[in-house]
Structures are given as structure tokens and as C-alpha cells.
A protein has these predicted regions:
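Alpha-helical scaffold segments that mediate packing/assembly in large oligomeric complexes
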Residues: 158-237
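Internal, hydrophobic cores of structured domains that mediate oligomerization or house catalytic pockets
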Residues: 130-160, 165-166, 182, 186, ...
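Short helix/loop capping segments that flank catalytic or ligand/cofactor-binding pockets
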Residues: 129-130, 171, 254-256
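Intrinsically disordered, low-complexity terminal tails
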Residues: 1-77
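Extended, solvent-exposed, turn-rich assembly/linker loops in the middle of proteins
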Residues: 204-277
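Sequence/fold signature of self-assembling virion shell proteins
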Residues: 2, 259-363
Length: 363
């Protein structure tokens, strides 16, 4: 039997969640955890109890509820802001390029954030993180993690939708979700532009991405990316690996030319070795691994030369978002029946490790 039902739902739960750096969904789940195999989290169980259907199942002749379902009771009204927030966040985080660039999302209760960094530029600190042998009487070296000098500022991403209360309440939730998804996709696309800027220039804490020129990696480089330059660039990520690459159209085409060269004697030999002779090679260090190639037209040239961004996804970008920033305007809309519904999220981005990303310029 459920521990938490609609009768327990009050507006104060949003403030309670906010004070604990939690979303309402997180708080509800902590109060009433899902049992193994239930398939629904605490918020979804409350939606089910309220009789609010968000999806149409045509083959069973079941249709999604209308937005009006959130107006039926005071408890249903409380569910609406979190429903909008969940739908928006899902659309943003599932946007393909965004999903591959962000390592983690961290909730905070403010619109500014001071991140912690392991200072690799400090020689003593860099030596301290090396797990080298020490004598029995010697102290272990201390690696220091410190707060960044510059705070990360959060910005609002989203849209304000002008629509009458009457028009929206009669819209099916399935169609309403499509509108929110469109807004979420556009917001995620705007976030990607900011992420790429943080990768390239840093977040204000002296952590711009190291840059490498193709000609310094391969003396035979002239204009087009070479296999030697590409592999040497990937090896710069040692001891980790470059698992994600972002480039514009020209950069992406040059990478594909290296990965899938035109039919030549060399490529035929590669094919024979791989198939005819049944010989394979492994690189267990994951330095040259399966790489996700991402296209983005916002990758600008650097010094007039094409730039290719490489990163280890787990070590590069953290998104910080303000808990409750998606909530207040949706709450005003349904309570006051206003004509402007603001669907947005306050968030910012910071660099986890300076060398988590590197840039290759084709020069």
C-alpha cells in the first residue's frame, strides 16, 4: 500500500524539496520509494491516483487527459508544475548532442555556483596526485581541491508561451507535451552553444581547452587531416581516452575521410588483414576507442582554421541547475489563470577537468 497519497500533497512540499536541494520528484521518491518491479516512481503513482493520463494508447482506445485534468482538484493543481518541469527536463536531456556532452547534472538552490577544482597547474599538487611509492616514515603527499576564483553564473533557458487559459485547458496532454518538447529541444540547442564555449574558453577559472595544431602532430600535414595527426591527437588524452568529438561540416567530413578512406592499396591491405587473414589488434588502454562523432554548425574556426573538439565525456562538463527554477511560473499559470506560461530552467556549465577536452586545429 502506498505510503504517500494525494491527500498528503501540499504546496509546502515544493519549498521543502527546494530547501534540501531536491526536486519534488526526488522528495516524493525519498518519502515513498518505488518497490522493485513497480515501474512507476512516486510522482507517477500520484498522477495515476489522480487519473491523469499523459499518453494515448490507441489500440486499447485509451486517450490522454486534457490539461484541464490538472484543474479538477487542489491536489491536481500541485502536480502541474512538476509535470511541466519533468517534461521539459526530459526533452532537454534527451536532445542527442546535449546528452553526449554533459557528464552530470547537479541541483543547487541559488543562481550562482562556486565549483571545486583539482589544481593541475600547481606542480606540487600535480605530484601529490601521483600514486608513487613513499618510504615507511614519510607522509603521503596531499592533493588539494580548492574553490574556483570565478563563480558559475546560471542563465534562464526556455520560452514564454502566450495562450489563454481556456485554450490550453482543452488541449490534450499528449499535444501539450509536444509543445513543451519543442521548447525543451530549442533550449537544449541553446545550451549546447554555451557548452561549446565553456569547452573552448573555460568557465572563467583558467581552464580553457589545450589546443594542438595538426602540423605539430604530423610534419607531412598540408591542408587535410591526416591519420597520423588524428591518432596523435587522440593519444594526447592519455591516460584516459577521447570518446566524443564535435565538429562542423568541414571538420566532420575530414574525420570521416580519415576513418573511411577512399579505396586504395592501403585500405585493401587493411581489409585483407582484418578479414582475409583473420588478424585483429586491440588497444586495452582505451586511448583509441569507439568515438561518438557529433555535428554542430556552431563550431567556429580558430585563427581562420577549422577546429575539431575532442573530449572525454565523463571528465569535461557538469551542468548546474537551480532547483525549482522550472516550477514557479507554471504554478502561477495554473493558480492565477494567467495568459503567459513560462517554461524555462536556470542552468550553467562548468569544466570538471581542464584537460578533459582538447581542440585540434587544422593548420
Amino acid at each position: 500500500m502506498a505510503k504517500f497519497t494525494l491527500s498528503n500533497l501540499t504546496p509546502d512540499l515544493y519549498q521543502q524539496a527546494h530547501s534540501q536541494d531536491m526536486t519534488l520528484s526526488m522528495l516524493l521518491e525519498s518519502l515513498d520509494p518505488a518497490t522493485e518491479g513497480s515501474g512507476l516512481d512516486a510522482f507517477e503513482r500520484l498522477m495515476k491516483e489522480a487519473g491523469i493520463l499523459t499518453k494515448t494508447v490507441r489500440d486499447k482506445n485509451i486517450f490522454s487527459s486534457k490539461v484541464d485534468a490538472f484543474y479538477r482538484t487542489n491536489e491536481n493543481k500541485i502536480l502541474f508544475p512538476e509535470y511541466v518541469a519533468r517534461t521539459l527536463v526530459q526533452a532537454m536531456t534527451e536532445f542527442p548532442i546535449f546528452n553526449y556532452l554533459v557528464a552530470t547534472r547537479t541541483p543547487i538552490d541559488s543562481n550562482v555556483y562556486k565549483a571545486s577544482y583539482l589544481d593541475w597547474d600547481d606542480t606540487d599538487n600535480k605530484k601529490a596526485v601521483e600514486m608513487r611509492r613513499v618510504t615507511e616514515a614519510a607522509d603521503l603527499p596531499i592533493a588539494r581541491i580548492k574553490l574556483g576564483d570565478t563563480a558559475i553564473t546560471l542563465y534562464k533557458y526556455g520560452r514564454a508561451v502566450e495562450a489563454s487559459y481556456e485554450a490550453l485547458r482543452r488541449m490534450s496532454l499528449e499535444l501539450f507535451e509536444r509543445h513543451i518538447n519543442r521548447i525543451g529541444t530549442e533550449a537544449a540547442n541553446n545550451k549546447v552553444s554555451e557548452i561549446l564555449t565553456v569547452i573552448k574558453d573555460g568557465d572563467g577559472n583558467s581552464n580553457a581547452a589545450p589546443k594542438h595544431k595538426a602540423k605539430d602532430l604530423d610534419s607531412s600535414f598540408s591542408a587535410a587531416l591526416t591519420k597520423t595527426a588524428w591518432i596523435k591527437f587522440l593519444l594526447k588524452f592519455y591516460p584516459y581516452g577521447c570518446d566524443t568529438v564535435v565538429a562542423n561540416e568541414d571538420g566532420l567530413l575530414q574525420i570521416l575521410e580519415v576513418l573511411y578512406p577512399a579505396s586504395t592499396v592501403a585500405s585493401k591491405m587493411d581489409e585483407l588483414l582484418a578479414k582475409g587473414l583473420n588478424v585483429s589488434t586491440t588497444l586495452p588502454q582505451d586511448l583509441v576507442v569507439n568515438t561518438t562523432l557529433l555535428y554542430n554548425p556552431d563550431i567556429d574556426k580558430i585563427g581562420g582554421k577549422e577546429a575539431i573538439y575532442g573530449l572525454n565525456r565523463s571528465n569535461t562538463i557538469e551542468e548546474i541547475f537551480e532547483v525549482g527554477s522550472t516550477i514557479s511560473e507554471a504554478d502561477k499559470f495554473i493558480r492565477n489563470q494567467t495568459q503567459i506560461l513560462t517554461i524555462s530552467e536556470n542552468s550553467g556549465f562548468r569544466k570538471i577537468f581542464k584537460d578533459g577536452a582538447r581542440i585540434l586545429t587544422l593548420e
